[in-house]
């Protein structure tokens, strides 16, 4: 559990530091961050959310569009695992 918390915090730091570089694309980066972070309500989703945050934080440096796609996929997977009321809407 401590390892997952550490990984999650590393992902958050990366996404915060990269968002300053993309200040002109603030709307896209905010949308990307929101998509990546949604993914769960319920028992099985915290791991998916943690992995999504880590991957999203790394991918913000390579492309906002890629981060948005990963976030959308994460939301769909979270919705499928947790039922119709969970995930990104």
Curated annotation (Swiss-Prot):
Q: InterPro entries recorded for this chain?
A: HssA/B-related
Q: Name one GO biological process term.
A: sorocarp development
**Domain of life of the organism in this record?**
Eukaryota
What the record says about family reads: Belongs to the hssA/B family.
This one is known as HssA/B-like protein 10
Organism per entry = Dictyostelium discoideum
